[in-house]
From Swiss-Prot:
It is found in: Apical cell membrane. Pfam families: SSF (PF00474). Its main location: membrane. The record marks 43, 300 as: Implicated in sodium coupling. The cholesterol-binding site is formed by transmembrane helices TM1, TM7 and TM13. InterPro entries: Na/Glc_symporter_sf, Na/solute_symporter, Na/solute_symporter_CS. The lineage of its organism: Eukaryota, Metazoa, Chordata, Craniata, Vertebrata. N-glycosylation is not necessary for the cotransporter function. Electrogenic Na(+)-coupled sugar symporter that actively transports D-glucose or D-galactose at the plasma membrane, with a Na(+) to sugar coupling ratio of 2:1. Transporter activity is driven by a transmembrane Na(+) electrochemical gradient set by the Na(+)/K(+) pump. Has a primary role in the transport of dietary monosaccharides from enterocytes to blood. Responsible for the absorption of D-glucose or D-galactose across the apical brush-border membrane of enterocytes, whereas basolateral exit is provided by GLUT2. Disruption phenotype: Mutant mice had significantly lower embryo implantation rate associated with lower litter size. On a standard diet, they developed symptoms of the glucose and galactose malabsorption and died within 2 days after weaning, a phenotype reminiscent of GGM syndrome in humans. Weaned mice survived and were fertile when maintained on a glucose and galactose free diet. This is Sodium/glucose cotransporter 1. The modification Phosphothreonine is found at residue 588. Disulfide bonds join 255-511, 255-611, 345-351, 355-361, 517-522.
Length: 665
């Protein structure tokens, strides 16, 4: 682009005050207010219309959800503000390769719906660590995975979403970051605590619609501004900043020029920033961990009313995952074209002036596009989109983390906890998570913004592969036992954490200032490292399992793929142990409800209604009804017609995935 085209954009964004003032108009503010009112209304509707007074109701929505809100919720839970900021930023810096991360999910959601979820449902579990406890016996794997998952939620998912949201809010509104985050977390926690999983899924559905509408509008404006797709491809390769030297210092050319392979997903296996073997195989391992074993994702599928709905919601999510390439990655690249000096800055002092960080400003590509390009009203809609993505991800994490804590950790501390106590504990833990999240903000704020998205992916590469290996072998290899699974997890964790600590001790570096980390440790791309770690974990699990005593088939009926259709009676490995919710505590609840009760005051009745703790409402289930409910929670049957329909759609989705990868290869 010529300098005359660039200069107005640069001038407009030199000072932050005009950006703040742009959003302060009646149209934008009205849209934002309406958005919050509608979201709270949906949350309150879910609060009054769903059963939140039981563990199954609060954490699994009573297995009564239909496919389309679950599919939307899966997408919204995955697409956080980190995607809008991180994907667009990576697109601005390096082209479309990161879109391959999104398209990889098209295959894994089919694996989730057709292979993993049927096993989870037959196991009758609420959490993923609980499945491993029932599959292997013992409690150490369950507790280990629960604690590790909670740490991953806090230090990767929550921190990334909060940081990304803060970037946008600070640029668009000029609010103090802590005030903005506190308000968002407060509203998010409010309808998560009060509504349970049903409220989260319904609000996610609303926010998915908002995200898609707003993103399509912005993408249309962006492509119109740049002159269409052909012009976009041509101008991106010429989007080079003019200020590349300062005195005697001149930046290296590769640090500020677009990559020659910017419009290719598959890149050189040695020199590529996203090597194609890592993208195919390494990313598949990370995606297996995220899509098939992560509590946030699987919990939504477990809430579906039957298996056909599970498969349909996975298929819908897969089709939605086609969109981020066009709605996030490419708009980020267009932002570099329109605001080259700002987004593609290379000199530390220039980047510091534009976005407050010396390592680069690609992370503000999407927010800048929104603030500079959108008209009044639509700008407010896009701010709502960013808040929607932030809040939907946080609600998913809060609900799933509270499930992990309540079902896998709290029940070990309080073995005879009543249903009501479990409900309160789950809600209080959400408040604890919020406190930790706010305390973590300064650390996230001080992180190198240019490295945030890679930071998230690398953490997953270091900690996720052993978990993926254990779940994969637990389902497909019945010979694997508890000793093999546990020590495979421990060895994999030690190797991964060693690489992570070493890398971050030396610093991840940047194009301008490469890291001094030894090549033998940090020279291996994190996607290649994920493959190596996965293979080591699998070998360790298999060797130890084959050297120790196997688990008899009588304990594995319907919990392994080879025994999934067995009709024989199963003896659970944990049958002799106390269940998460012991019978005597259930009896206590029943006795309490039958005894004469004092009339509750207005405040107490309102409190019980607000938190879903009014268990007296409605008749108690008989033993026969309880058995019927248990059968429903573990039923994987399908009607032949709908099984055929969803299977055909699954095949079409896989074909679309192959086409997309081939077209942009």
């Amino acid at each position: 682009m010529d300098s005359s085209t660039l200069s107005p954009a640069v001038t407009a964004t030199d000072a932050p005050i005009p950006s703040y003032e742009r959003i302060r108009n009646a149209a934008d503010i009205s849209v934002i207010v309406i958005y919050f009112v509608v979201v709270m209304a949906v949350g309150l509707w879910a609060m009054f219309s769903t059963n939140r007074g039981t563990v199954g109701g609060f954490f699994l929505a009573g297995r009564s959800m239909v496919w389309w809100p679950i599919g939307a919720s899966l997408f919204a839970s995955n697409i956080g503000s980190g995607h809008f900021v991180g994907l667009a930023g990576t697109g601005a810096a390096a082209g479309i390769a990161m879109g391959g991360f999104e398209w990889n999910a098209l295959v894994l959601v089919v694996v989730l719906g057709w292979i993993f979820v049927p096993i989870y449902i037959k196991a009758g579990v609420v959490t993923m660590p609980e499945y491993l406890r029932k599959r292997f016996g013992g409690k150490r794997i369950q507790i280990y995975l629960s604690v590790l998952s909670l740490l991953l939620y806090i230090f990767t998912k929550i921190s990334a979403d909060i940081f990304s949201g803060a970037i946008f809010i600070n640029l668009a509104l000029g609010l103090d970051i802590y005030l903005a985050i506190f308000i968002l977390l407060a509203i998010t926690a409010l309808y998560t605590i009060t509504g349970g999983l049903a409220a989260v899924i319904y609000t996610d559905t609303l926010q998915t619609a908002i995200m898609l509408v707003g993103s399509f509008i912005l993408t249309g404006f962006a492509f119109n501004e740049v002159g269409g797709y052909e012009a976009f491809m041509d101008k991106y390769m010429k989007a080079i900043p003019t200020k590349v030297s300062n005195g005697n210092f001149t930046a290296k050319e590769e640090c500020y020029t677009p990559r020659a392979d910017s419009f290719h997903i598959f890149r050189d296996p040695i020199t590529g920033d996203m090597p194609w073997p890592g993208l195919i195989f390494g990313l598949a391992i990370l995606a297996l961990w995220y899509w098939c074993t992560d509590q946030v994702i699987v919990q939504r599928c477990l809430s579906a009313k039957n298996m056909s709905h599970v498969k349909a919601d996975c298929t819908l999510c897969g089709y939605l995952k086609l969109l981020p390439m066009f709605l996030m990655v490419m708009p980020g690249m267009i932002s570099r074209i329109l605001y080259t000096e700002k987004i593609a800055c290379v000199l530390p002092e220039e980047c510091q002036k534009y976005c407050g960080t010396p390592v680069g400003c690609t992370n503000i590509a999407y927010p800048t596009l929104v603030v500079e390009l959108m008209p009044n009203g639509l700008r407010g809609l896009m701010l709502s989109v960013m808040m929607a993505s932030l809040m939907s991800s946080l609600t998913s994490i809060f609900n799933s983390a509270s499930t992990l804590f309540t079902m896998d950790i709290y029940t070990k501390i309080r073995k005879k906890a009543s249903e009501k106590e479990l409900m309160i504990a789950g809600r209080l833990f959400i408040l604890v998570l919020i406190g930790i999240s706010i305390a973590w903000v300064p650390i996230v704020q001080s992180a190198q913004s240019g490295q945030l998205f890679d930071y998230i992916q690398s953490i997953t590469s270091y900690l996720g592969p052993p978990i993926a290996a254990v779940f994969l072998l637990a389902i497909f290899c019945k010979r694997v036992n508890e000793q093999g699974a546990f020590w495979g997890l421990i060895l994999g964790f030690l190797i991964g954490i060693s690489r992570m600590i070493t890398e971050f001790a030396y610093g991840t570096g940047s194009c301008m200032e490469p890291s001094n980390c030894p090549k033998i440790i940090c020279g291996v791309h994190y996607l290649y490292f994920a493959i190596i770690l996965f293979v080591i974990s699998v070998i360790t699990i298999l060797i130890i399992s084959f050297l120790t005593k196997p688990i008899p088939d009588v304990h594995l009926y319907r919990w392994c793929w080879s025994l999934r259709n067995s009709k024989e009676e199963r003896i659970d490995l944990d049958a002799g142990e106390e269940e998460d919710i012991p019978e005597d505590s259930k009896d206590t609840i029943e006795i309490d409800t039958e005894a004469p009760q004092k009339k509750k005051g207005c405040f107490r009745r309102a409190y019980d209604l607000f938190c879903g703790l009014d268990q007296d409402k409605g008749p108690k289930m008989t033993k026969e009804e309880e058995e019927a409910m248990k059968m429903k929670m573990t039923d994987t049957s399908e009607k032949p017609l709908w099984r055929t329909v969803v299977n055909i759609n699954g095949i079409i989705l896989l074909a679309v995935a192959v086409f997309c990868h081939a077209y942009f290869a």
